[in-house]
């Protein structure tokens, strides 16, 4: 007899090993998203701005 919990466990593991953004298989050290999606999602749109100077 097939264990229904085993099927759910297999699906859960498969989801955990897949990028939540693009669906690519994750490497061992990656969690939730692959390195490419992480770089895209975490890129700072203000990275070209300079640090503000104190007036006082």
Swiss-Prot record:
It holds the Pfam family NinF. Belongs to the ninF family. It comes from the Viruses. It comes from Enterobacteria phage P21 (Bacteriophage 21). The gene is ninF. InterPro entries: NinF (IPR008712). This is Protein ninF.
């Amino acid at each position: 007899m097939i264990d229904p919990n085993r099927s759910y466990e297999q699906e859960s593991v498969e989801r955990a090993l897949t990028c939540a953004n693009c669906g690519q298989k994750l490497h061992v050290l990656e969690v939730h998203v692959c390195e490419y999606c992480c770089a895209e999602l975490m890129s700072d749109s203000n990275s070209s701005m300079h640090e503000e100077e104190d007036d006082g």
